[in-house]
Amino acid sequence: NRGLLALGFWVASIFSHVVFEEFRFFPFLSLYGDPRTGKSFLVLLLNRLFGLDMEGLPATKDNTSKGEKRRMSQFSSMVIPMLEAQEGSTRFDFNDLLPMYNRNPAQTRAATTNNNETIEIPFHATLTFVQNHEQFKTRAAMERVVSIPFADTDITDESFEHFQKLSEFSPENLSAFGDHILKNRKYFEVDIVNAVQSFSDLFVEKGVRARRIAENHAIAFTGFALLNSLIEWKTEEDVRSLTEYMIQLGKTKIETARSETPNADAFLEMLEGIPDGNAVRRKDNNLYLRLGEAMKAIEWPKGNLRELTAEFKRHDNFKGNKNDRVFGLPDPVKVWHFKMQPLSEM
């Protein structure tokens, strides 16, 4: 089931431009769990299926943040596996997942001119994180990732035998798979949006109540489902088992990323590490923030400002948004007011 769902994500990624055009987002994939359970071999195999003979991009401090983002911009509608991206041992910023989920630029900087010209590094690829331990700490990040766990107890004599057989295929032979997909691209391009919507509705009906999470998991599942319909590969029982597994993954994700306001949750959670000053003030059980200063303090991307402020207003702890003198400045300033409550208690 794990390998088939990962394959589905790779297939869906080839047509991610079609999915994004309709839904305005595309999820990330996380393959995580015990070492020596085949995660690295799986991503190498999947990349070779689509003509890319590489395991992925090692996420280490030897890579600069700009270098990684420029490398990502070289790919479009293809999966880039990020290998062992561990907080503290990589320059990759997991908060970048928030704007990249909506395919905002990986980086925007001012051009060396006197006008308002900017230079952007586009992001049109998809990302898979291959790691022993997941690094997604905020609800907002977790909600945007389809997580597939691997455990050493999953390895059997039969699965090891299949592993050995797959290892015998050359990259040249494996790439015929991707060629077959692209020769039938019209089939996928025509059906993928409706299929994602149908499977998303099914997952919601079966208990994956968070629509965003249902849609993320439906995208990965749709890649497999359309492939299976094209080549008539797996039995109905196999597909039923995989569907049930995907629904369970979605339900598990809801439990680990339970929130209707993930961006606001993440923003307020990051502010917990910012002392009182120009950005934030705390008084009794109240939190006051100046949005512009707070965004600078936590280096929050400006790309999803509208979504962020909309979530602020829906947040359970939101008390108001008005001009106030709480910051002690000569004139009142616009302030967002929240009741203070640790996210762990929500």
Outline where the language-model segments fall.
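Conserved alpha-helical scaffold flanking the Walker A/P-loop in AAA+ ATPase domains
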Residues: 58-81, 85, 116-118
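Structural recognition of the conserved hydrophobic beta-strand(s) that form the central parallel beta-sheet
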Residues: 81-83, 108-110, 122-132, 146-149
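DNA transaction DNA-binding modules
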Residues: 191-346
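Conserved catalytic network of the ASCE P-loop NTPase/AAA+ motor domain
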Residues: 71-75, 89-91, 118-123, 137-141
